[in-house]
Structure formats: C-alpha cells, structure tokens
C-alpha cells in the first residue's frame, strides 16, 4: 500500500474500453482536485516498430513466437521499478510510444518510435497507469503487488479481435493478413501474461456485444456501446451499495452476488459512480482489498 503516493492501474488492450476508463478517472481526479501523473504501458516496450519487426522475423526463423503481450517485448522490470519509485517518493519518469503520424509529427519523429524519457511532473497526488501489464506477475517480477487500485477492462475475446483488426488496419496501416498473423502469434503470451491479470484486479469491466460477432475476422465495424452490455465484477463487496447503483444506472441488474450488469452506454457513468469512493478511500490512506 502506497499510502502517500497511491498507484492506480487500468489493465487491458487499447480499444478494449481503456479510453472510457481513463476519461472516467480524469473526471474523478478533477472532482477530487487531484493531480495525477500519467504513464502509458506502451512506453515500456523494448523495441521500436522496425526493431520489433526484426525480432519477430528472428523468432519465427528460430521456431519461436514473440508478441507485445509477453516479457520479451516489454520491460516488466522497469515497469515494476516505476511503480516502486513512485510509491516511495512520488517521482519517476515517462515517455510515449508514437503509434501514428498524427502522434509522431509534433515530435518530428516517425511512427513506431519513442519520445525521450522525461521526469514525471511534480508534485502529484497519484500515479495513473493505462496499458497491458498493470497487474502482470512473472517468476522474476510482480508488478501487481505495487498497485493500490487495479482495474481490468476486457471485452469478450471475439470483440477484442474485431477491435484490433479494425484499429490496426484503419489507424495504423497494417494489412488484415498481418493483423491476423499477429493474433495467432500472440495467443500463447495472451494466455500466459494477459488473462491471469484479470483474476488479480479489484474490479473488472467486461463488454459483451448483443450482436453477432461469431466471425470476428469478417466484421465490418465495431459493435457500439449501445449494442453491448458491460459486466462488472467486484472482488470485494465491502462498501458497494448495489441498491443505489441499480437506482442510478437505468437498465442495470445483478446477475451474480458480486456482478452488476449495465447497458453499454452507461459504462462511463458506472465507472465514475463505482470508482470515485474507492479513489477517495485511497487518498484517505485506506487499503482497498
């Protein structure tokens, strides 16, 4: 527990709803008058895009797989050290991975490269991480133990593949074949390093579409929030006022003793209502179980 300098992490693939989650947290920080230092998970990649392409080819020639989900392409040690340092001193460093030309041009760089490391702003009240590995645990590193509030954002897997396919082809210039190859290549790392994190979270938000996603690789568009439900799982029920949440979130219902289901369009509001009191508890120096 980092009582003086709490660490909040949202873990999940980009496009999974992490943007909605980040917006909800920023609203909460503003409402509580908190200054947050933000760290992006992509900044802990080991390789630039050309370097990663070369690493993939070398791994394939050697009969191995490498992906952005696993430790070979990410510096889990540096991520863990970042959380430790911030928890102890409120200090650290960050950089950005530039995915697109729009992101790269202001830095006079090309897509697929990193900005220089820079110190985190000071003073701040909380560290906010958004990325793939906020709750990762390996034999060498335990990132999850340094997180005070861990939130998982994960769609059902077919929806995740649809989001990846459409995002990577329309925004990042990849071919459909390259994206499908990436899905196959990433599966072992996804199973070993991504999915176990969602058993360590305090909360999970899982988007479930109500339209047919049986063949994600033939999808022409991403199901909208209004075409989805969001399944919210609570690890600990202490302080969770289900009757109040049901009254505030029209169309919501309880599907299990520790699970609330809300219409997709209510996802952002649900996050704000649920997480604001949790952030308040953190800032009061209380531990979230």
From Swiss-Prot:
CDD domains in the record: PRK_like
A Pfam family of this chain: PRK
Binding-site residues for ATP, renumbered to this chain: 12-20
Catalytic class of the enzyme: transferase
Family matches, as Gene3D superfamilies: P-loop containing nucleotide triphosphate hydrolases
GO molecular function: ATP binding; phosphoribulokinase activity
UniProt keyword list: ATP-binding, Kinase, Nucleotide-binding, Transferase
UniProt xrefs under SUPFAM superfamilies: P-loop containing nucleoside triphosphate hydrolases
Cellular component per GO, a single term: cytoplasm
GO biological process, one term: carbohydrate metabolic process
InterPro entries: P-loop_NTPase, PRK, PRK/URK
EC number(s) from the headed UniProt entry: 2.7.1.19
Catalytic reaction annotation: D-ribulose 5-phosphate + ATP = D-ribulose 1,5-bisphosphate + ADP + H(+)
Organism superkingdom: Bacteria
Cited NCBIfam families: PRK15453.1
Family to which the UniProt record says this protein belongs: Belongs to the phosphoribulokinase family.
Name of the protein in question: Probable phosphoribulokinase
Organism field: Escherichia coli (strain K12)
């Amino acid at each position: 527990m980092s009582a003086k300098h709490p660490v909040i992490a949202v873990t999940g693939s980009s496009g999974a709803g992490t943007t909605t989650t980040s917006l909800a947290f920023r609203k909460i920080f503003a409402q509580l008058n908190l200054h947050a230092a933000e760290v992006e998970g992509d900044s802990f990649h080991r390789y630039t895009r050309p370097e990663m392409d070369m690493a993939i080819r070398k791994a394939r020639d050697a009969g191995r797989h490498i992906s952005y989900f696993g430790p070979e392409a990410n510096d889990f040690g540096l991520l863990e050290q970042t959380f430790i340092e911030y928890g102890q001193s409120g200090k650290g460093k960050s950089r950005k991975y530039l995915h697109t030309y729009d992101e790269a041009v202001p830095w006079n760089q090309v897509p697929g490269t990193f900005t220089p490391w820079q110190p985190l702003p000071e003073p701040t009240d909380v560290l906010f991480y958004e990325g793939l590995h906020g709750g990762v645990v390996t034999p060498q590193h335990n990132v999850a133990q340094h997180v005070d509030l861990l939130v998982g954002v994960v769609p059902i897997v077919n929806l995740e593949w649809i989001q990846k396919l459409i995002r990577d082809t329309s925004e990042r210039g990849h071919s459909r074949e390259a994206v499908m190859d990436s899905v196959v290549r990433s599966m072992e790392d996804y199973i070993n390093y991504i999915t176990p994190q969602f058993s360590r979270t305090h909360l999970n938000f899982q988007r479930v579409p109500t339209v047919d996603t049986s063949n994600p690789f033939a999808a022409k568009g991403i199901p909208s929030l209004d075409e989805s439900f969001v399944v919210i799982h609570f690890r600990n029920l202490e302080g969770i006022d289900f009757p109040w949440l049901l009254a505030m979130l029209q169309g919501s219902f309880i599907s299990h003793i520790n699970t609330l289901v809300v219409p997709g369009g209510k996802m952002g509001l649900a996050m704000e209502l649920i997480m604001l009191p949790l952030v308040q508890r953190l800032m009061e120096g209380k531990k979230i179980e």
